[in-house]
UniProtKB/Swiss-Prot annotation:
Its main location: plastid. This is Photosystem I P700 chlorophyll a apoprotein A2. PROSITE patterns: PHOTOSYSTEM_I_PSAAB (PS00419). It comes from Panax ginseng (Korean ginseng). Chlorophyll a B1 binds at H654.
């Protein structure tokens, strides 16, 4: 009996119902709530698990390299990146029959294969990999790193190698290590790789371990570095006629500021990127030497924060007390990390398509669409997680005495003002945007499209013009040829940048009009509403006017009985749960907008987006319905084609999504009654009644059923859109 799951909670292990299993799974990672947990063991467990996480990441990336080297067509893709379709891996058992085998045999392969839409081919090509042997070498190296990570994780669980709590709470050393050791050194190492391997490869020179000590990355070697003539490294860059991967039109520069894109690959100049990483490395190496550790010099974080008291007195005691609050709360630290990472991930999505870093990826439209959508969804989940852990911080870790009258306390003191302002902004955006869309819908329906309300986004156009886009005729800042900003950059990066901004073959500063104005405000509605729900959930996590003692009920209580006017749907968990639906909704609008605008751009019929995006029926008919037609034809009475797998996934995604509602729109009593009936029938059925179970079956709790419903809703939603996105894009552009 002592060994029953969960081992970390004796109370749960002795529960006679199936609740034991579900609650066990739900709290498996909530180390703080486990029996016998100490602060020291908590930190040590989390630290050791990080190595396991790294091991999984290295193993996964190793697998990518290995499968492409084994079953892909990297070497033939390298010969013609624009016309050969990159293969991810083989398909052992294509469904169904000979037509499937024929449909999936492509990309020059001998048998059925999956096409890669992840951009790894372009990435590996850009950083200097050229052969399958290179890929195998990389796979083995990452496998080695994975093994090292596992050993390190195991090692740090051994008594002799377990770090102490004081080591984990040494904020200055950790900052220095992460800034200099991780960001600084890795950026410097990456600059080294770009200069020594990637840039020579882009010029047709193959540098590997056997010759990298003999090949000078720059004709003058380290001379210019030591003599202070750093500008020599920027002289003689690749010409605009340079053929990537060959010496034709190649230069000798290694660190440049050309601006814009390489004309052939439509990606950023490699020498610009090397320069960028060197600058980042320098900044972070300096930043990592700013905090006081063993030598008694530099900043103390506590002193810095305690000194941050705005003199006007309008923020009370400012940042006093924050050092200990943050340093002693893992949830606060995780919340900050997730908020930062979420924003960065969304920025990655925005920059990967507008400023492509990898050669030829801009012309691989399906990959562009897949990467944008992937990173925006990931960002959404990470950002909602930030608020969830912020709420848990307020419930478990926040001390009013430690934070008296500082910025945290003042946030809680005027939470009504924050929440009501967000609510007002959301209502304003929602009613006005929907009002405009619906008005336009009605005008179209009654055959008077000229009566639509179409608003030009003049402020956004002005901002684009300030960055050098000339088509709007604003003549301001970088789009004004006689301004100081224009003249200052004329000799370095500006010509390349202006050329890129004003050329219509890329995604940098797309021309915008009334359709963009409307969908921008629809997205703003989604962002503000999601934020409203999350912020309210976190700020009310300790208590609200209705339920001042909410803190005592924890993070995820369902209700507090019928008293107080009914307290269902007000726990911090409920806010997170509702916010995820809004987050998915918002990212749906974001990705619909991005995808439709780009499909029309790539097909050369931008007027379709411009004309149809100003009313809801246009979105439903000319984006969703029109682009799902090929998808629905993956299987038809005449057979099947290579889109069949996406057609199946589209259907399956809808099924999973719809299953979510079974958990979301029904209450416990129904399930409990059903379970009792099934258990009764089971116990009275010959043969079946030979199988017994220890735990009495009980229905999921309200919170658990909601989680299961939310998981199905999210997974189904994403599967459905992923299939639609990839099939509709690859069906058009291959």
């Amino acid at each position: 009996m002592a060994l029953r799951f969960p081992r970390f909670s004796q109370g749960l292990a002795q529960d006679p119902t199936t609740r034991r299993i579900w609650f066990g799974i739900a709290t498996a990672h909530d180390f703080e709530s486990h029996d016998d947990i100490t602060e020291e063991r908590l930190y040590q467990n989390i630290f050791a698990s990080h190595f396991g996480q790294l091991a999984i990441i290295f193993l996964w990336t190793s697998g990518n390299l290995f499968h492409v080297a084994w079953q892909g067509n990297f070497e033939s893709w390298v010969q013609d990146p624009l016309h050969v379709r990159p293969i991810a891996h083989a398909i052992w058992d294509p469904h169904f029959g000979q037509p499937a085998v024929e449909a999936f045999t492509r990309g020059g392969a001998l048998g059925p294969v999956n096409i890669a839409y992840s951009g790894v081919y372009q990435w590996w090509y850009t950083i200097g990999l050229r052969t399958n042997e290179d890929l195998y070498t990389g796979a083995l190296f990452l496998l080695f790193l994975s093994t090292i990570s596992l050993i390190a994780g195991w090692l740090h669980l051994q008594p002799k190698w377990k770090p102490s709590v004081s080591w984990f709470k040494n904020a200055e050393s950790r900052l220095n290590h992460h800034l200099s050791g991780l960001f600084g050194v890795s950026s410097l190492a990456w600059t080294g790789h770009l200069v020594h391997v990637a840039i020579p490869a882009s010029r047709g020179e193959y540098v590997r371990w056997n010759n990298f000590l003999d090949v000078l990355p720059h004709p003058q070697g380290l001379g210019p570095l030591f003599t202070g003539q750093w500008n020599l490294y920027a002289q003689n860059p690749d010409s605009s006629s340079h053929l990537f991967g060959t010496s034709q039109g190649a230069g000798t520069a290694i660190l440049t500021l050309l601006g814009g894109f390489h004309p052939q690959t439509q990606s950023l100049w490699l020498t610009d990127m090397a320069h960028h990483h060197l600058a980042i490395a320098f900044i972070f190496l300096v930043a990592g030497h700013m905090y006081r550790t063993n030598f008694g010099i530099g900043h103390s974080m506590k002193d810095l924060l305690d000194a941050h008291i705005p003199p006007g007195g309008r923020l009370g005691r400012g940042h006093k007390g924050l050092y200990d609050t943050i340093n002693n709360s893992l949830h606060f630290q995780l919340g900050l990390a997730l908020a930062s990472l979420g924003v960065i991930t969304s920025l990655v999505a925005q920059h990967m398509y507008s400023l492509p870093a990898y050669a030829f990826i801009a012309q691989d439209f399906t990959t562009q669409a897949a990467l944008y959508t992937h990173h925006q969804y990931i960002a959404g989940f990470i950002m909602t997680g930030a608020f969830a852990h912020g709420a848990i911080f307020f419930i478990r870790d926040y001390s009013p005495e430690q934070n008296e009258d500082n910025v945290l306390a003042r946030m809680l003191d005027h939470k009504e003002a924050i929440i009501s302002h967000l609510s007002w902004a959301s209502l304003f955006l929602g009613f006005h945007t929907l009002g405009l869309y619906v008005h336009n819908d009605v005008m179209l329906a009654f055959g008077t499209p000229e009566k639509q309300i179409l608003i030009e986004p003049i402020f956004a156009q002005w901002i684009q013009s300030a960055h050098g886009k000339t088509s709007y005729g604003f003549d301001v800042l970088l789009s004004s040829t006689n301004g100081p900003a224009f003249n200052a950059g004329r000799s370095i990066w500006l010509p390349g940048w202006l050329n890129a901004v004003n050329e219509n073959s890329n995604s940098l500063f797309l021309t915008i009009g009334p359709g963009d104005f409307l969908v921008h405000h629809a997205i703003a509605l989604g962002l503000h509403t999601t934020t409203l729900i999350l912020v309210k959930g976190a700020l009310d996590a300790r208590g609200s006017k209705l339920m001042p003692d909410k803190k005592d009920f924890g993070y995820s209580f369902p209700c507090d009985g019928p008293g107080r006017g009914g307290t269902c749907d007000i726990s911090a968990w409920d806010a997170f749960y509702l916010a995820v639906f809004w987050m998915l909704n918002t990212i749906g609008w974001v990705t619909f907008y991005w995808h439709w605008k780009h499909i029309t751009l790539w097909q050369g019929n931008v007027s379709q987006f411009n004309e149809s995006s100003t009313y809801l029926m246009g979105w439903l008919r000319d984006y969703l319905w029109l682009n799902s037609s090929q998808l629905i034809n993956g299987y038809n009475p005449f057979g099947m084609n290579s889109l069949s797998v996406w057609a199946w996934m589209f259907l399956f995604g809808h099924l999973v999504w719809a299953t979510g509602f079974m958990f979301l729109i029904s209450w416990r009593g129904y399930w409990q009654e059903l379970i009792e009936t099934l258990a009764w029938a089971h116990e009275r059925t010959p043969l079946a009644n030979l199988i017994r179970w220890r735990d009495k079956p009980v229905a999921l709790s309200i919170v658990q059923a909601r989680l299961v419903g939310l998981a199905h809703f999210s997974v189904g939603y994403i599967f459905t859109y992923a299939a639609f996105l990839i099939a509709s894009t690859s069906g058009k552009f291959g």
